[in-house]
């Protein structure tokens, strides 16, 4: 199958995994994961045909997102106990173009794939840029009691619960910009969680 994208694909390589999202309203079932077999300008050749119809124009046009990264953080046993990452108060640093796969502990409060936990204003200037978070059992990125964080150009694919989550709802001065979220599935309320909308 060949897919034409609307702009140059800088840094994309043969062998990278991509998703082509559904292009029908209220449909996540049309999203398909494929591997790039060739790149010719804006045309990607995929390892096998797409089964669903994907539109390149209109309100619900498909997105093509790259899930591959050079740096990979993943659980050793995705079928067993999954890992998680957490930045605490006075942490320093950020995340740039890394893949987080098979993380997040299902049904456990505070054990998310990427979690900024009660950092207040100490993370000022920190950012998560270009991350790919894949197959999380407990959200993609959670910002909890943390201010001044930038989350930009990230791809979240398959999550239980909210994908991009401001946990208290009182977090301010954070920027979530140009992120893609695909297939965030309904989860159960977490233990001791006071938020009724989860």
Where are these regions (language model features)?
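Beta-strand/loop edge motif enriched in small/polar residues
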Residues: 1-148, 152-198
């Amino acid at each position: 199958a060949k897919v034409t994208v609307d702009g140059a694909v800088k840094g994309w390589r043969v062998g990278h995994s991509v998703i082509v999202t559904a292009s029908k309203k209220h449909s996540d079932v049309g999203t398909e994961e494929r591997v790039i077999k060739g790149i010719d300008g804006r045309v990607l050749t995929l390892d096998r045909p797409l089964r669903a119809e994907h539109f390149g124009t209109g309100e619900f046009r498909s997105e093509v997102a790259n899930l591959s990264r050079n740096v990979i953080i993943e659980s050793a046993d995705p079928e067993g106990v999954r890992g998680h990452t957490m930045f605490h108060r006075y942490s320093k640093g950020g995340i740039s173009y890394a893949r987080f796969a098979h993380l997040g502990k299902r049904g456990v409060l505070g054990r998310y794939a990427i979690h900024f936990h009660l950092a207040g204003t100490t993370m000022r200037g920190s950012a998560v840029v270009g991350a790919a978070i894949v197959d999380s059992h407990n959200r993609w990125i959670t910002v909890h009691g943390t201010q001044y964080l930038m989350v930009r150009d990230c791809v979240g694919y398959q999550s239980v619960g909210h994908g991009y989550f401001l946990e208290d709802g009182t977090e301010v001065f954070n920027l979530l910009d140009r992120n893609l979220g695909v297939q965030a599935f309904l989860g159960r309320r977490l233990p001791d969680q006071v938020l009724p909308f989860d």
